[in-house]
Amino acid sequence: MNLHEYQAKDLLESYGLKVQKGIVAHNPNEAAQAFDQLGGKFAVVKAQVHAGGRGKAGGVKVVKSSQEAREVAESLIGKNLVTFQTDAEGQPVNSVGVFEDVYPVTRELYLGAVVDRSSRKVTFMASTEGGVDIEEVAHNSPEKILKVEVDPLVGLQPFQAREVAFKLGLEGKQINDFVKTMLGAYKAFIECDFALFEINPLAVRENGEIVCVDGKINLDSNALYRHPKLLALRDKSQENAKELKASEHELNYVALEGNIGCMVNGAGLAMATMDIIQLYGGKPANFLDVGGGATKERVIEAFKLILDDENVKAVLINIFGGIVRCDMIAEAIIEAVKEVNVTVPVVVRLEGNNAEKGAKILADSGLKLIPADGLADAADKVVKSLG
């Protein structure tokens, strides 16, 4: 689950980090009032969406008066912002953040952290190249990114943060401020179950103060039950409607741009299914994992979800029965096909627990389902069914 910038800054501030002060505004008048409240000569109006690249897309503007703040807010709120991280429709802007002007600054740094699956540790990253796309820095100048793996038994130690500060070229009071920032960020990361955290840029002001000018936080969705207050910050308007509906039925769904709908049990098998569809010349319309313990109700909802996509011209169902029984899946498929009134070809591959029984149920149903013998045969048949 992603947080908006203003939410991320509020959370980080509660852990002792110095952040760029700001006020969220849901309409142009509130934006104008926020400018006056901040009391500076300048302010920055930022569209609050769950996407990066806002500045390049026109979602970040410097304003010099309350009237300008009102005008910029009016141009953003109620519109969709399209950035390099969104699809063609963009993300809806329901609010803007009006933030204090912290510039000029002497330096812009980068600080971030992720759960590194290879090392199985929280890994911090820091760079002197703040204020730009960190992906470009990682690609073009990987040596400019410092990495610190944190031992989960002892946590981030002050000496590790100081070492990073020295390597970033900080000095004097800046070092202590950076250490406090990094330690506070780690504490927030662990206590709030972050999956990803970024401050870009982390600015060094002329007075030596270190301030978080931006904030990006992604929370581990599997841990949200432990954080009801954070869950209350969820903005469903920023989520894909189909993915949101899928999550309500405990389905793992990601919309893609192809025309072959996929229903699979198990993430690994789902990825392999998408790969082989591509190999045979097709394009998957989605990633959909119904889970290892799929129920009949969940399979029916998955079918509806796939066919809600107007781009889907064929469906491939690939089930390997382990915990889930193939005969139960077959019954759910029949029920779903009848309920949804399917008009596109449906290829079904069943293997494993009660696969033969499931295949017989499908064959005796009288429905025009296309059976497949093996994954390659399934991919070949679903691609050919498109004509």
UniProtKB/Swiss-Prot annotation:
Its cofactor is Mg(2+). One of its GO terms (molecular function) is succinate-CoA ligase (GDP-forming) activity. Heterotetramer of two alpha and two beta subunits. ATP binds at K46, G53, R54, G55, E100, Y103, E108. Signal peptide: none annotated. One of its GO terms (cellular component) is cytosol. Residues 9-245 form the ATP-grasp domain. It comes from Francisella tularensis subsp. novicida (strain U112). Binds 1 Mg(2+) ion per subunit. It comes from the Bacteria. Pathway: Carbohydrate metabolism; tricarboxylic acid cycle; succinate from succinyl-CoA (ligase route): step 1/1. One of its GO terms (biological process) is tricarboxylic acid cycle. This is Succinate--CoA ligase [ADP-forming] subunit beta. Its EC number is 6.2.1.5. NCBIfam families: PRK00696.1 (NF001913), sucCoAbeta (TIGR01016). Succinyl-CoA synthetase functions in the citric acid cycle (TCA), coupling the hydrolysis of succinyl-CoA to the synthesis of either ATP or GTP and thus represents the only step of substrate-level phosphorylation in the TCA. The beta subunit provides nucleotide specificity of the enzyme and binds the substrate succinate, while the binding sites for coenzyme A and phosphate are found in the alpha subunit. The keyword ATP-binding applies. Keywords: ATP-binding, Ligase, Magnesium, Metal-binding, Nucleotide-binding, Tricarboxylic acid cycle. Substrate binds at N265, G322, I323, V324. Belongs to the succinate/malate CoA ligase beta subunit family. Gene3D superfamilies: ATP-grasp fold, A domain (3.30.1490.20), ATP-grasp fold, B domain (3.30.470.20), Succinyl-CoA synthetase domains (3.40.50.261).
